[in-house]
């Protein structure tokens, strides 16, 4: 029985699932909006919220933790600690939103956009 087991396996082993979440996290912060399946978006959301909170903290230890989580991508970490932290400074959580969009052709998987609530206007045009 799997009563009270948190999280979704997403048909992957642990290391593959963690790598996928980290890569999706980097893409989310880089593009500020990505399209993925609904279960993946629901798994990504709490991780993204925690990393944005690290960005708002702004100290050296938080920067090193974020660098570790974001696969060492210094460009994304810089954006997180400058742009995203500044945009979300007055928001107490709820930095992301999930918008259900369609069903994917081929396997009929439910798709959704996961995006940052305080998105940049220029990234919306992309």
Curated annotation (Swiss-Prot):
One of its GO terms (molecular function) is structural constituent of ribosome. The keyword Oxidoreductase does not apply. Disulfide bonds: none annotated. SUPFAM superfamilies: Prokaryotic ribosomal protein L17. Keywords: Ribonucleoprotein, Ribosomal protein. PANTHER family: LARGE RIBOSOMAL SUBUNIT PROTEIN BL17M (PTHR14413:SF16), RIBOSOMAL PROTEIN L17 (PTHR14413). Part of the 50S ribosomal subunit. Contacts protein L32. HAMAP family: Ribosomal_bL17. This is Large ribosomal subunit protein bL17. It comes from Magnetococcus marinus (strain ATCC BAA-1437 / JCM 17883 / MC-1).
């Amino acid at each position: 029985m799997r009563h009270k087991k948190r999280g979704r396996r997403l048909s992957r082993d642990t290391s593959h699932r963690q790598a996928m979440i980290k890569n999706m996290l980097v893409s989310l912060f880089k593009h500020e909006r990505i399209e993925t399946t609904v279960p993946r978006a629901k798994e990504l959301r709490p991780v993204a919220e925690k990393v944005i909170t690290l960005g708002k903290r702004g100290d050296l230890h938080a920067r090193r933790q974020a660098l570790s989580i974001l696969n060492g991508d210094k460009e994304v970490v810089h954006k997180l600690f400058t742009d995203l932290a500044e945009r979300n400074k007055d928001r107490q959580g709820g930095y992301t939103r999930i918008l259900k969009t369609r069903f994917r052709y081929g396997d009929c998987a439910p798709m959704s956009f996961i995006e940052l609530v305080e998105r940049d206007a220029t990234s919306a045009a992309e």
